[in-house]
Amino acid sequence: PVLCSYLLNRKSTDKKVEKEAWVARKLKELYGKALNGALIHKKIVLGCTIGLFLIALGTFFTLGRSFLPPFNEGSFTINVSSLPGISLEESDEMGRRAEELLMQVPEIQTVARKTGRAELDEHALGVNVSEIEAPFVLKDRSRDAVMNDVRKKLSTISGANIEIGQPISHRIDAMLSGTEANIAIKLFGTDLNLMFTVGNQIKEAIQGIPGLVDLKVEQQIERPQLTITPKRELMAQYGITLPEFEEYVNVMLGGEAVSQVYDDGKTFDLTVKTSDESRTTMEDIRNLMIDAGGKKVPLSYVAEIRSVTGPNTINRENVQRKIVISGNVSERDLRSIVNEIQQKVDASIQLPEGYHIEYGGQFESEQAASRTLLLTSLMSLLVIFLLLYNEFKDAKESGVILLNLPLALIGGVFILKLTSGEVSIPAIIGFISLFGIATRNGMLLISHYTHLRTVENVPLKQAVLQGSMDRLNPILMTALSSALALIPLALNGDLPGNEIQSPMATVILGGLLTSTFLNGFIIPIVYLLMNKEDKE
């Protein structure tokens, strides 16, 4: 206001009003004719708009659902895993074979591989797992086409499970479900062998679902193990308590840190344990001497030592044993694939008593985020209504302004259907932002109608016509400026860094288009109908 008082004097403003641009004059002329026609055929206009809204609402429920849109990170992260227990040499050879196949893809110029990771690494891996980073440069093919080519080539490696993703996407999946895949089917139970059998049955049941790729069951093999079971009666005869026995076995076989040594600025644990030569064979372990009331006796006197087989790993969640059947999504939305998985599992898998399945990964996060955003959007609508009511002091006028929300929803839904065909979390955030933006146009019209009727004493219908014409330019200018700012984001969704912004911009752009166009007809019609009593 201060700048306007200095820069816009009355004389120059009057000249500009007299010399209104021909585009604005033409638009007002066309809009005036269209608005008069709409006011004559109110029922037809309202009926068509309601029909559009119902179609958009039905279309919304047919759209696919996903947590986040696919990222374009410019690099593939590929996990090549075989059965635990494979030698480092065999795993390295398998990794080299994968590298050779990757280099046959034209878009990939270089690869980098890690086979296994150190035990103290924050993401420790056995030597049976190779992690390959393969940067790519897109040429004539899309990212999905290149990924499918990579997947097809690597599927020729026998005895290997392949997972293909991208660096950040892999980390997100790992944080969400503990597995580096989009979908994690978690099977909980007690018997690991039975769980592994049921897990393979689930894999076979869902193997042919379109769009489900990189399907695998968590690797489990039986490995030789040594069990040492105390003989309690003999321990009592020799005067050995159970805590003493447990500490002895831990120290002799596992070692115990008793102090620390500083050397050259570094700290090392001083560990007490038996020598490696003294525990090479089972017979060596049987002959280890244990203190027994002032004398020593062989360990085999007071314990049963047996060689058995057991699982290489036991994973738990909330104290329950679990195995994971994991998979990725390709060229299809996440929600529909998970729904089909649930249908096939429910129809073909009979779970033993005490066993149950949970679906995790991006699907679980998408459901939780959608519920949170739905609650947030309802709260925001309530706040918007209260603010409008506080300003206009009229529930009817506040309700008329909120009619812009379904008008905006129409464009947002249709533009999603024409572009990605999926509703992701960024798209939902776009809808919430759109609802706030869309109320602006209704406020401009209603506030001007009220001013004309109360201050200038203009009759109802004339106030609606004149107010709509007066506010045409401001509404179009604000909508156009917002749209022009959003177009670059909406059109460049494939560029790295724009993947999340693009769905939001697309939804807002489509909603602005329909809300701006329909706002100029629906708000005047509804305002006129709701104020008939005042006119009479």
PLM region descriptions:
Residues 1-12, 425, 435:
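Hydrophobic, well-structured modules enriched for small/aliphatic residues and gly/pro motifs
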Residues 10-12, 50-87, 141, 177-182, ...:
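Transmembrane helices with small-residue packing motifs
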Residues 15-19, 83, 429-433:
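Short beta-alpha connecting loops at secondary-structure transitions
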Residues 17-69, 109, 156, 160-161, ...:
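Signature of alpha-helical transmembrane segments and their immediate interfacial
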Residues 83, 116-117, 137, 273-275, ...:
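Residue-level recognition of strand-loop junctions within catalytic nucleotide-signaling folds
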Residues 87-90, 140-146, 194-197, 332-337:
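Short, conserved charged micro-motifs
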Residues 89-179, 233-255:
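Solvent-exposed, membrane-proximal periplasmic/extracellular interface segments of envelope transport
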Residues 153-533:
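C-terminal transmembrane helical bundles of large multi-pass transporters
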